[in-house]
């Protein structure tokens, strides 16, 4: 059976892995053929079968394998009887003791049992279907496929399971698990199947190949796909738009200097430009020759492709961001004039070789400062391949191999590659939800372990050496999205980590442990203050500074807003909440700067509000998520329904978008289309219901008219499962407008948090006691008698 291991290295024999904090937060999967009873194996198989049978209706996994493991290890048994509010009948009495609190206590008890030994909550953080295939391709090219994923191994079985389970009915694969089929992911997953031993006549391969050929073949794959297929030898580098490594030796005053790029864009094109500059191609194996035959139509086989023309081709299914004409003009100029010069003597000797070395220096720097995890999974594989191209037997490549397990995750739908783990992000919200429950006496050890994890996960130092020369910002005092070893500061992760430490510092140390030293809190404040932009908003990773017109040069076809760093509503709100709390507890530290920061940040939030009263959420789906965050920031700064027209408009949006059954349900299509789109059939989603509910609570809805809150609470209470869990529903995370991300822990964190805030706010108003609510009414009006 598969087992999740937490807080461990790869064993004493692996000298190529190291940690800054004894691997706190590290989560890796290992297969033990001797583990598990027949009953446990049967439970796993039942979970797999259930997912398979329902895969057309529910795409995200329920992340059951590690949950089964943890619940068994902790001998968990739900001892609090389940309560439900009757759906039938005219009225149903609800009291604080019998309904909301019972559901809350059951959920807290269940969720506490899922905490790992090091204090964090493990969870899947995946969903995009272009994460895993490049890893398999890289290992195939470097000759390490059988080392990492041996033939006939359980790893291969689970990878194949994942690919098969998420193939769409039309034979293709989407950009993410809920998306329509795209050329990019269909071609990559087809190649992955073939590398892993699936024959071309296998039903999954045959239907995928038909999908590809019916749309003209892989000449229409987007630019990232063209790059990977060129590396493999199934495409030609002359069919790619130029990615000159000379970019990395440009003068820093130029507007398109890489130091001004968004860090993820910079980190993707850094190794890509190295591989392009080398024109690296893997060995042309018999399989590669077969793929050349399989992926091109008979009318235009591989050897007859017009590669120059192919550079600008992109399947309509992939074209979310069509290139503007100015971008194509730049690519054509580089392709026709610049590249022919830079690849000939003496320019190839004195310019290109220098550019390649500088690029590789940056790759090594980033690898070292992330302990070879790198900033994310797309970048990880490219940097690993670049290290192998430079030195196939070098330590850098071996250190990359040692960190591959950090990215792999196993659930009932198979093995997938994570973005890079959401350990700190999930734990920060989990702790806040548990603290809001007011069940401190019941969960003291849970809070203490969580507190220790958060303290252990704070980044203690800035990047090494002259980090500004390497285009890096300060990181000391920050929190990452995953764990300390990752090393990359994130503003909202830092703000949420700071909030946790401040909240826990107000509690008895004998329950939650020693509070964090003030100096470390000051470091966190310093990071947040350093990131605010001129218009008051906060970016996620690095200061905003580049010209917005640079987005015209976005080289991807399926993402938007990826060239430069931008401000985000969620990051800004988190920072407001954290700094407001900090200023109350430490009024003597940089108070004027913090007050000025909050004033500008509130101005940014008010300006960012949409006409309908909502805010666009960049990291969750979508307007519901953004509105919850924005209202939290506004409330922390003293903005109320009474004194703020911004808050009143937001409340109007939330009440108008509440569904018939009291919840909220928003389609992921809201994100790419940038307009509110309800779930099909006006269904509700429990995570989004929690967001909408907490948004109204921030805006004082409990004091004005609690009926909408009662209706939402009824949905959450009645949806809770027998063991205290909540059901998995639609995907709720997003990045770069167009790609969805599955946060498996959200289904526990947010319903718990919403119920906790509901109980706390409404208990204060004594609304829950002795109140008879018309639960079956869909009206937002209620009378007290």
From Swiss-Prot:
PFTB repeats lie at residues 10-53, 104-146, 156-197, 447-491, 521-566, 598-638, 647-688, 709-750. It is an enzyme of class 5 (isomerase). Pfam families: SQHop_cyclase_C (PF13243), SQHop_cyclase_N (PF13249). The active site is at residue 492. PROSITE patterns: TERPENE_SYNTHASES. One of its GO terms (cellular component) is lipid droplet. Keywords: Isomerase, Repeat. Its EC number is 5.4.99.39. It catalyses: (S)-2,3-epoxysqualene = beta-amyrin. GO terms for molecular function: beta-amyrin synthase activity. One of its GO terms (biological process) is triterpenoid biosynthetic process. InterPro entries: SQ_cyclase_C, SQ_cyclase_N, Squalene_cyclase, Terpene_synthase_CS, Terpenoid_cyclase/PrenylTrfase. Pathway: Secondary metabolite biosynthesis; terpenoid biosynthesis. The keyword Nucleus does not apply. NCBIfam families: squalene_cyclas. Oxidosqualene cyclase catalyzing the conversion of 2,3-oxidosqualene (2,3-epoxysqualene) to beta-amyrin, a pentacyclic triterpenoid with anti-inflammatory properties. Belongs to the terpene cyclase/mutase family. This is Beta-amyrin synthase OSC2. It comes from Citrus sinensis. The lineage of its organism: Eukaryota, Viridiplantae, Streptophyta, Embryophyta, Tracheophyta. The gene is OSC2.
């Amino acid at each position: 059976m598969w087992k999740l291991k937490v807080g461990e290295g790869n064993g004493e024999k692996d000298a190529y892995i190291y940690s800054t904090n004894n691997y706190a937060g590290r989560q890796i999967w290992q297969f033990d053929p001797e583990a598990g009873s027949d009953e446990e194996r049967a439970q796993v198989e039942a979970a797999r079968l259930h997912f398979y049978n329902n895969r057309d209706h529910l795409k995200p996994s329920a992340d059951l394998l590690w949950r089964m493991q943890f619940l068994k290890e902790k001998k968990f048994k739900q001892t609090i009887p389940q309560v439900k509010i009757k759906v039938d009948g005219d009225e149903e009495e609800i009291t604080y003791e019998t309904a909301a609190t019972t559901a809350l206590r059951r959920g807290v008890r269940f969720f506490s049992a899922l905490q790992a030994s090091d204090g964090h909550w493990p969870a899947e953080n995946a969903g995009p279907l272009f994460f895993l295939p490049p890893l398999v391709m890289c290992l195939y090219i470097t000759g390490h496929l059988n080392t990492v994923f041996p033939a006939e191994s359980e790893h291969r079985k689970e990878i194949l399971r994942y690919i098969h389970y998420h193939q769409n009915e039309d034979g293709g694969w989407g950009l993410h698990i809920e998306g329509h089929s795209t050329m990019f992911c269909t071609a990559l997953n087809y190649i992955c199947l073939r590398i892993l031993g699936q024959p071309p006549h296998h039903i999954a391969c045959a239907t995928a190949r038909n999908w590809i050929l019916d749309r003209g073949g892989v000449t229409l794959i987007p630019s990232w796909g063209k790059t990977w297929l060129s590396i493999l030898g199934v495409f030609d580098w002359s069919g790619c738009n130029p990615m000159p490594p000379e970019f990395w030796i440009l003068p820093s005053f130029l507007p398109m200097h890489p130091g001004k790029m968004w860090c993820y864009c910079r980190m993707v094109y850094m190794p890509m430009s190295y591989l392009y500059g080398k024109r690296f191609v893997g060995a042309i194996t018999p399989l590669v020759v077969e793929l050349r035959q399989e992926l091109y139509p008979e009318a235009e086989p591989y050897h007859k492709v017009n590669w120059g023309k192919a550079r600008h081709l992109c399947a309509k299914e992939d074209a979310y961001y069509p290139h503007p004409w100015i971008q194509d003009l730049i690519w054509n100029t580089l392709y026709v004039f610049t590249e022919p010069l830079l690849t000939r003597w003496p320019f190839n000797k004195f310019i290109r070789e220098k550019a390649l070395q500088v690029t590789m220096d940056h790759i090594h720097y980033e690898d070292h400062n992330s302990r070879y995890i790198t900033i994310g999974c797309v970048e990880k594989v490219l940097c690993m391949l670049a290290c192998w191209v430079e030195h196939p037997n070098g330590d850098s490549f071996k250190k990359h191999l040692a960190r591959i397990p950090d990215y792999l995750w196993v659930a009932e739908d198979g093995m997938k590659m994570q973005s890079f783990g959401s350990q700190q992000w999930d734990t920060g919200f989990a702790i806040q939800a548990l603290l809001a429950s007011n069940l401190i006496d019941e969960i003291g050890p849970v809070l203490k372990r969580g507190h220790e994890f958060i303290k252990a996960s704070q980044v203690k130092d800035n990047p090494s050496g002259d980090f500004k020369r390497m285009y890096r910002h300060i990181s000391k005092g920050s929190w990452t999205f995953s764990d300390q070893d990752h090393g990359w500061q994130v503003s909202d992760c830092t703000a949420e980590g700071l909030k946790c430490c401040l909240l826990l510092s107000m509690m008895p140390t004998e329950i939650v442990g020693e509070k964090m030293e003030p100096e470390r809190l000051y470091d966190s404040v310093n990071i947040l203050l350093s990131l605010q932009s001129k218009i008051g908003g906060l970016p996620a990773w690095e200061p905003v500074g580049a010209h917005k017109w640079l987005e015209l040069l976005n080289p991807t076809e399926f993402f938007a807003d990826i060239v430069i760093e931008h401000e985000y509503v969620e990051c800004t709100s988190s920072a407001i909440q954290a700094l407001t709390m900090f200023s109350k507890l430490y009024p003597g530290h940089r108070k004027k700067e913090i007050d000025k920061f909050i004033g500008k940040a509130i101005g940014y939030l008010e300006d960012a509000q949409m006409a309908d009263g909502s805010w666009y959420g960049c990291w969750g789906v979508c307007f519901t998520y953004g509105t919850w965050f924005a209202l939290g920031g506004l409330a922390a700064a003293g903005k109320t329904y009474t004194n703020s027209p911004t808050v009143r408009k937001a409340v109007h949006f939330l009440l108008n978008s509440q569904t018939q059954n009291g919840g909220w349900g928003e389609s992921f299509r809201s994100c790419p289309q940038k307009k509110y789109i309800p779930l099909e059939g006006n269904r509700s989603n429990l995570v989004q219901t929690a967001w909408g509910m907490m948004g109204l609570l921030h805006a004082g809805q409990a004091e004005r008219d609690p009926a909408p809150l009662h209706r939402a609470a009824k949905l959450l209470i009645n949806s809770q499962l027998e063991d205290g869990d909540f059901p998995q529903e639609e995907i709720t995370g997003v990045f770069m407008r167009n790609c969805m991300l599955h946060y498996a822990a959200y289904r526990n964190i947010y319903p718990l948090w919403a119920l906790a805030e509901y109980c706390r706010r409404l208990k204060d108003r004594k609304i829950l006691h002795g109140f008879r609510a018309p639960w079956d009414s869909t009206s937002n009006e209620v009378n007290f008698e």
